[in-house]
Amino acid sequence: MRLLTRRAGHGAATLALRVIHMQRVPVLRLPAILDMERKIPSRESPRRLSAKPGRGTEMKKLARPLGVVAADSDKDSGFSDGSSECLSSAEQMESEDMLSALGCKREDKRRQPSKAADTALPTLPPMVVMKSVLVKQGSSSSQLQSWTVQPSFEVISAQPQLFVLHPPVPSPVSSCQTGEKKSESRNYLPILNSYTKIAPHPGKRGLNSEDRGTSGVSKKLCTERPGPSLSSSEPAKTGRVLSSPSTPAPPSSKLTEDSTLQGVPSLGAGGSPQTLQPVSSSHVAKAPSLTLASPASPVCASDSTLHGLESSSPLSPLSASYTSPLWAAEHLCRSPDIFSEQRQNKHRRFQNTLVVLHKSGLLEITLKTKELIRQNQATQAELDQLKEQTQMFIEATKSRAPQAWAKLQASLTSGSSHSGSDLDTLSDHPDV
């Protein structure tokens, strides 16, 4: 909507509002507020003019929200000389206050960029351009209600001044909250390397100083080990011992026997090197299924003990390398004559996994679980055989046939669960 103004002569402020309604025209958006220039009123016309009641009602209709249009055709609002009406002192002071308020709004509007006004208010009501007219606005407590209330218009006795009435712009989002959110987003970093790698790739693994020292000691022990290297059958045998814990003797006892047969000194519980005595088969059978993870075992030696013995005597790290449960894996990983480079990498990764499992205690749990599974399977087989023999005994008791007793006796003879005295008792008393 566009408002055209015309001015009458001889210092009398006359208003002529011409309203042109153009259909399907987008709502105009406001630029920055124009600079206001207050001029000294003329001395020749001391009387102040005011608007007539009919003129005020028309202007109220024009200033309603969403720009209510009066008519489609051009309309003249008439003239108003206002010769007998003057502004009171209270109204004059109020008009000055409103001028200062408009000046403050003009400065605030200059600070805001033009893009903010375009994006914040995509649909603005029509713009009203007036000359020598002051809008009486309500209290500026709420910005939304200040435009919904119908304003009143007053004519001031001054030179024609240009005012642009615009709806209040909503206050932008406080920059403090946005800055705090941005700072929080900048300070937040994802947790890197939260979980340890069980078996990292040799080229990508990251070891700390202790792990690097331990690996360096093991490499030095394996490379500087005197004497002829083991043949291809010996590491294969040792690998079978480590991979199959279902055998009666544990892998630690196998390694202990090998070290005893070769006459290599090993570490005792107190940390001093000593020579192991030959272990008989009965002691090996009565020994616990896993001794490599116990802290008081001669086979288990901590990393600090290995470092201390390496600095004190040259033979103690050698014995620790033989008695360590990981010696076979280290030997398999560092035998270039037997394995190719690709298989060495695989075995090195297997060694890393074995070391981590041994330190965390999972290796001990796994070996104990496998041993319990083996014992459970053996016990289950014995229970099945006992059930079968019980069924045969019930049938022989009911039928009292010599063939059933002979079959039961053959089953008991082939089984290892009963002794010979029990067989003699069953044969002597067939009617039991």
Swiss-Prot record:
<protein>
    <recommendedName>
        <fullName>CLOCK-interacting pacemaker</fullName>
    </recommendedName>
</protein>
<dbReference type="InterPro" id="IPR031602">
    <property type="entry name" value="CIPC"/>
</dbReference>
<feature type="coiled-coil region">
    <location>
        <begin position="364"/>
        <end position="395"/>
    </location>
</feature>
<comment type="function">
    <text>Transcriptional repressor which may act as a negative-feedback regulator of CLOCK-BMAL1 transcriptional activity in the circadian-clock mechanism. May stimulate BMAL1-dependent phosphorylation of CLOCK. However, the physiological relevance of these observations is unsure, since experiments in knockout mice showed that CIPC is not critially required for basic circadian clock.</text>
</comment>
<feature type="region of interest" description="Disordered">
    <location>
        <begin position="71"/>
        <end position="98"/>
    </location>
</feature>
<keyword id="KW-0678">Repressor</keyword>
<keyword id="KW-0804">Transcription</keyword>
<keyword id="KW-0539">Nucleus</keyword>
<dbReference type="GO" id="GO:0048511">
    <property type="term" value="P:rhythmic process"/>
</dbReference>
<keyword id="KW-0597">Phosphoprotein</keyword>
<dbReference type="GO" id="GO:0005654">
    <property type="term" value="C:nucleoplasm"/>
</dbReference>
<dbReference type="GO" id="GO:0005634">
    <property type="term" value="C:nucleus"/>
</dbReference>
<dbReference type="GO" id="GO:0045892">
    <property type="term" value="P:negative regulation of DNA-templated transcription"/>
</dbReference>
<feature type="compositionally biased region" description="Low complexity">
    <location>
        <begin position="411"/>
        <end position="424"/>
    </location>
</feature>
<comment type="subunit">
    <text>Interacts with CLOCK. Forms a ternary complex with the CLOCK-BMAL1 heterodimer. Interacts with CAD and HSPA5.</text>
</comment>
<dbReference type="GO" id="GO:0005829">
    <property type="term" value="C:cytosol"/>
</dbReference>
<feature type="region of interest" description="Disordered">
    <location>
        <begin position="408"/>
        <end position="432"/>
    </location>
</feature>
<dbReference type="Pfam" id="PF15800">
    <property type="entry name" value="CiPC"/>
</dbReference>
<keyword id="KW-0963">Cytoplasm</keyword>
<feature type="modified residue" description="Phosphoserine">
    <location>
        <position position="246"/>
    </location>
</feature>
<keyword id="KW-0175">Coiled coil</keyword>
<keyword id="KW-0805">Transcription regulation</keyword>
<feature type="region of interest" description="Disordered">
    <location>
        <begin position="194"/>
        <end position="315"/>
    </location>
</feature>
<keyword id="KW-0090">Biological rhythms</keyword>
<feature type="compositionally biased region" description="Polar residues">
    <location>
        <begin position="272"/>
        <end position="283"/>
    </location>
</feature>
<dbReference type="GO" id="GO:0042754">
    <property type="term" value="P:negative regulation of circadian rhythm"/>
</dbReference>
<dbReference type="GO" id="GO:0005730">
    <property type="term" value="C:nucleolus"/>
</dbReference>
